[in-house]
Amino acid sequence: MTVVRYDSIRAAEQCLRETGGNGSASQTYDVLRAVERCFWRCLAYFAFRHFAYALSCAFGIRRPFRIYAVCDGKGVVLCAPLHLGADGVWSVVAGDFVELDFVDFLYARRGLPELAEAFAAVMQRMRADGICSVTWRYLETGGVTSELLKCQPHETTETFANVRVSFAGGAERFDATLPRNARSVERLARNRLRREGRSVSFSFRSSTGLGEGLSGREPRRLLRECRRVYLGRQKRRYGHGGWLARLFFMHGCYISLSVPGGSSFVAVLRVDGRVAAYMEGYVNMARAALEVPRIAIDDRFARYSPGRLLIAEAARWLCANSRLRCIDLCRGDERYKLDLGGTLYETATVRVGTGGAK
């Protein structure tokens, strides 16, 4: 296998877009794009020339960026996007800097022995380039990298709880398996809305052809309204919400910048024409899942349990209109996620040495 190094995203894109010449690395663009579609995490890495990165440069906190691609005769086997420390001897897998909830190398659909060979090759190349350690933040335990790391020393410093809601049996099965408490809360909320004469509407938009589209003036206006709700929630919960936070969340983070990107999805619950709850994320066809790192409610409508209503309705809508059978609610093990039949899994911060000189 051949390991190719790129010291900027622009250089990587330019090389990968070429056809002919320069061996297999120059012919792997289509393969890499296929990997990108399967692993939505790549959107943040290869769309990194955006506001958040520019802002970090302006404030002098830019970290050098590097991409390693491991190729064979069939195409890209592994892609490792990294931020390097100022001294160039430590690295962090890219993604968490733009609030990505899953961070990992990108792997093609190959057998574990091939992936292990590619992993060993990229670690050897990093060692030769003077990188002494690699850190994953929010690495999913039980994934390919976790499996590969079983064979070598590594350090896990912290873990994070995550929740996903599955409905593989379809909408009827989903409703039947909901805990009694979740069914009664939803019924109470709907009855309350009806009794008070509130108008209720759900809308589902994506850039993948599911539901309505995300391009145009009206969707942009809707997204601005949704993100104001999210910013309000962030300020109440964490004390964030100044002008810099507003600028970042409205324009800079990876979810905002995915619109109208290749796999973004937005679901909205309106009560009397106002956004009561919304969730925003990505379609991940490799997992047949909707990944939702961002969900928020307007506290003025909290008595109607809008978050629960939206997630449950989204599950039913996805069953009827797509092949997606999971909503991954990402970090956080809040009660409402578990009440909807969610199951817990972990991500972790993991550090591994390459064997290079420190």
Descriptions of predicted regions:
Residues 78, 101, 159-161, 265, ...:
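Residues that flank catalytic or metal-binding motifs in active/ligand-binding sites
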Residues 4-91, 139-146, 150-157, 176-303:
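A conserved beta-strand-loop-helix scaffold within acyl/acetyltransferase catalytic domains
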Residues 159-162, 166-180:
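Active-site-proximal, glycine-rich beta->alpha crossover segments in alpha/beta enzymes
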Residues 157-165, 344-355:
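Conserved catalytic-core motifs of GNAT/GCN5-like acyltransferases
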Residues 131, 197-199, 264, 324, ...:
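Short secondary-structure junction motifs
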Residues 107-110, 165-167, 206:
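Short beta-strand-to-loop capping motifs
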Residues 85-157, 285-344:
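Acyl-donor binding region in acyl/amide transferases
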